[in-house]
Every structure is written in structure tokens, then in C-alpha cells.
Design a protein with these regions (language model features):
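Condensing-enzyme catalytic core mediating Claisen C-C bond formation in acyl metabolism
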Residues: 1-95, 196-274, 278, 282
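Short beta-strand segments
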Residues: 9-12, 126, 155, 180-186, ...
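Short acidic, glycine/serine/threonine-rich loops at helix termini
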Residues: 19-20, 134-137, 165-166, 191-197, ...
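Conserved catalytic cysteine-centered active-site region
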Residues: 57, 61-82, 89, 93-96, ...
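Hydrophobic alpha-helical hairpins/lids featuring a short glycine-rich hinge
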Residues: 99-108, 112-113, 128
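Short acidic capping loops at alpha-helix termini that bridge into adjacent secondary structure
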Residues: 116-122, 150, 178-179, 291
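Flexible, glycine-rich active-site loops centered on histidine and acidic residues
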Residues: 176-207
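Single conserved hydrophobic/aromatic residue that forms the stacking wall/gate
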Residues: 285-293
Length: 293
């Protein structure tokens, strides 16, 4: 096998200690819906507002296949008067929430790859959201783990993990890094609209990490060849999360539904599934099967 073969040599997974079942989510949401409908009864009857429909555990499972999800902080999510996690604000000198969960996943990936901080040249944090714009979460993680070299953040929504892997692959292939640590600290619950029947059940919180390096430098018990990589993007307005630093300049309300995650689920399904299937098939066709000796 060529010395240029690039592999995934270690993976790490962190899951929160808290879970929310469909049944818990439905009880909370339905209580919120009843409260909302009562408070806006006149506007609803006048046709100025739409009533909030009830949900059910059966509806959620049929629509998504999901029965339960992990969340970073459970407090506040199930409170009909709040409907969002209540996460204590940390001082600037403390490790951020997102860096903390990233570090936990990273340590497991390093252990699986039999690597130390001195073996890593770059850190990529790639996820749907970062909790701040700068300093980069990746550089905060780099500092916490004692890694030299460089780090940067990427935001690529649902494809964040795969885009990070491709960037890592390219850096190792180009020789600009011996090994790259990619981390996906998905802290999505603060942007999940728990007041919306059609999306409140979709996301949870998790952090994953991988080590990418050449096979010749790998000493892990298990490693997996990367056969090829290829990226593709198409713009769509059918899935959005509009919160950003312009919210105050726009004189906008950061808590209105427009600024939370929202989607046209059926349209997203029709856009994404054919594209993803075609993309995967194209990669299979251009990849040469590889068997480890």
C-alpha cells in the first residue's frame, strides 16, 4: 500500500448526561400550546394568528424515527413558560461550554489513536453553530489540550463533520500537517425552537472527534482508509437559522421564530435525499476498493 494512504486513526464521542423523551417533550409543548392559544384567543378567532396545534409522541416517531435525544442542559427546556435551556453564563476566563464538550470528545479520540498533543499539528472545530465569533473555539481547545500549530472554526450546518474531514485530509495530503484533530461539538439545543411543533424534536446535543493522519504514522489498534473525498453544496432557502450579529442593528427580536432553526421539511427532504444519494453513488463509483493486508 502506498505511503500516501491517509486514515482515520481515532474517534471520540461525548454525550450529555441528560435525555428528553418524546413523551416529556410532548407534555411540555402541548402545555405551551394551550397557554399560547388561550393568551391569543381573540387574535386566533379573528384569523390574525394561527393556533398552535398539539403534538404527540407517535407523530414525532413517525416523522423522524426519534424516541429520545440528549441535551447539554435539560433545565428550562420543558418549562412551558421558557421553552429553551437555562445555561449559566461563564466568565471569560473559564473554558466555554462548547470548548469543554469538544475537549471531552478530543481526549477520547487521542486515546483511541494513541496520540498525544505533541503529535497533532492542527485542530478544526466544525459544527452548525459556535457560541461566539472569536476567539475561535478550535484555538481555545488547542490551548486547553496543549497542542502547538494552529486551529480554526468552520460552520457548515448538517455537513460540518464531513467538510472538516475533507479539510483535514487535504492538509495531511499536502504535508501541511502530520495529524489533524477534527471536532464537532454540536450544541444545538439553544437554537432549537421548542415552541414549534414541526421542528422541536429534531436535534439534540453531542460532540464527536476524529484524528486524521497518514497510515505510516498511525499506531492505533483500528484505523480506516479514506478512499476519496469530494464536496458539493447547493443553496436552499428551505432550511434556515437567521440569528446573527446583525440582530440588534436590524432592530429585530432575537427570540422570534424567524431567528430560530426552521425549515420546510418536505421541501428539504425532496432536495437533500436525491442529491445525497447521487453524491454517495458517485463517490462509490470513483473509489477503488481497498483491502487491508
Amino acid at each position: 500500500m502506498s505511503n500516501q494512504q491517509i486514515v482515520i486513526s481515532g474517534v471520540g464521542l461525548w454525550t450529555p448526561p441528560h435525555q428528553i423523551s418524546n413523551e416529556e417533550l410532548v407534555v411540555s409543548y402541548n402545555a405551551f400550546a394551550d397557554r399560547y392559544n388561550a393568551e391569543h384567543q381573540a387574535a386566533i378567532e379573528a384569523g390574525e394568528l394561527a393556533a398552535k396545534p398539539h403534538s404527540s409522541a407517535e407523530f414525532i416517531e413517525k416523522a423522524s424515527g426519534i424516541r429520545s435525544r440528549y441535551v447539554y442542559i435539560k433545565d428550562g427546556i420543558l418549562d412551558p413558560a421558557r421553552m429553551t435551556p437555562q445555561i449559566p453564563l461563564r466568565d471569560e476566563g473559564d473554558l466555554s461550554d462548547q470548548a469543554e464538550i469538544a475537549v471531552e470528545a478530543a481526549k477520547k479520540a487521542l486515546a483511541a489513536a494513541n496520540k498525544t498533543a505533541s503529535d497533532i499539528d492542527a485542530v478544526i472545530v466544525s459544527c452548525a453553530y459556535t457560541q461566539r465569533y472569536y476567539p475561535a473555539i478550535a484555538i481555545e481547545v488547542q490551548e486547553a489540550l496543549g497542542i502547538k500549530g494552529f486551529g480554526f472554526d468552520m460552520l457548515v450546518a448538517c455537513s460540518a463533520a464531513t467538510f472538516a474531514l475533507q479539510r483535514a485530509y487535504e492538509m495531511v495530503a499536502a504535508g501541511t500537517a502530520r495529524a489533524v484533530l477534527t471536532i464537532n461539538p454540536e450544541l444545538t439545543s439553544p437554537q432549537n425552537n421548542f415552541r414549534d411543533r414541526d421542528s422541536h424534536f429534531i436535534f439534540g446535543d453531542v460532540a464527536t472527534a476524529t484524528i486524521i493522519e497518514r497510515q505510516e504514522t498511525s499506531s492505533s489498534e483500528h484505523c480506516y482508509d479514506i478512499l476519496t473525498t469530494q464536496a458539493e453544496t447547493i443553496f436552499s432557502n428551505n432550511i434556515r437559522s437567521n440569528i446573527g450579529y446583525m440582530v440588534n442593528a436590524n432592530d429585530d427580536d432575537p427570540y422570534r421564530e424567524y431567528n430560530y432553526f426552521h425549515q420546510e421539511g418536505r421541501k428539504v427532504f425532496k432536495e437533500v435525499c436525491p442529491m445525497a444519494a447521487a453524491h454517495i453513488l458517485s463517490l462509490i463509483h470513483i473509489s477503488e476498493p481497498t483491502r487491508r493486508s
